[in-house]
A protein has these predicted regions:
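Conserved catalytic-core segment of NTP-binding enzymes
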Residues: 146-147, 153-214
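Phosphate-binding loop that captures ATP/GTP phosphates
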Residues: 67-69, 73-118, 123, 130
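Phosphate-binding/switch loop-helix module in NTP-utilizing enzymes
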Residues: 115-166
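Residue-level signature of catalytic and energy-coupling elements of molecular machines
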Residues: 35, 46, 72, 80, ...
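Extreme N-terminal, non-catalytic leader segments
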Residues: 1-45
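Walker A/P-loop phosphate-binding motif and the immediately C-terminal alpha-helix
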Residues: 37-75, 190
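Short glycine/serine/threonine-rich phosphate/pyrophosphate-binding segments
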Residues: 50-56, 77-81, 152-160, 182-185
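Amphipathic alpha-helical transducer elements in NTP-driven molecular machines
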Residues: 32, 77, 126-134, 157, ...
């Protein structure tokens, strides 16, 4: 076991330090904010279309009359603002960040909404990235959200663990594609959700076929 940092929110060890403690330390929202259901969109593999599926889910629920938000947890590879055609920057008060609102009323928060240029790289270590994800949840003025979709980065690393342990995730949607290699890696994300008792509420096989023109 590595040296303990006493930050149980980013640790998967079941050691004596956390005996009697819940492994899930849910971070509270800002006072006056409300978020109903929270769903993570995950895949062990990159390039399968998680961000596009996240965007389409958000648009669909918004069209059904719900207040919707998207939290872009892919800190080093954010693409949610681009998917919605957003190129501006998020505003802030003295003590909070304001989500960017799309033309159809969907609330967005992504690291690309905080950078001076959307092509600037994010070169941060894992603990800093995890802290940013928590800030996106607890320091943003989310306004009466019925459904929040969290666009997760590929893999089963620090960010996924951080989200599952500090956000009240109601379930995950798994995104895959038909390739055998992708299937093998996606199973890692499935098993992670099962190990952490996060319900799998949907499976999307993206890029499964192409319809040729006549």
């Amino acid at each position: 076991m590595s040296d303990c940092t006493h930050d149980c929110s980013s640790c998967g060890e079941n050691c004596a330090e956390r005996q009697g403690e819940s492994p899930f330390q849910i971070k509270p929202l800002r006072e006056g904010c409300r978020v109903g259901k929270v769903y993570g969109v995950v895949s062990g593999k990159g390039g399968v279309g998680k961000s596009m599926v996240t965007s389409q889910l958000a648009v669909t629920m918004q069209r059904r009359g719900h207040n919707v938000a998207v939290l872009d947890a892919d800190i080093t590879g954010p693409s949610i603002p681009k998917a919605f055609g957003i190129h501006g920057r998020a505003a802030a008060t003295q003590d909070a960040i304001l989500p960017v609102i799309t033309g159809t009323g969907i609330q967005l928060m992504s690291v690309n909404l905080l950078l001076e240029h959307e092509t600037d790289p994010v070169i941060w270590r894992g603990p800093v990235i995890g802290g940013v994800v928590q800030q996106f949840w607890g320091d943003v003025l989310w306004q009466d959200v019925d459904y929040m979709f969290v666009d997760m980065p590929p893999g089963t690393g620090d960010v996924a663990l951080n989200v599952f342990q500090t956000l009240p995730v109601d379930g995950v949607i798994i995104v895959a594609s038909p390739q055998e290699l992708v299937s093998m890696v996606v199973q890692k994300a499935v098993k992670m959700a099962q190990m952490m008792n996060i319900p799998i509420v949907g499976l999307v096989e993206n890029m499964s076929y192409v319809q040729c023109p006549d």
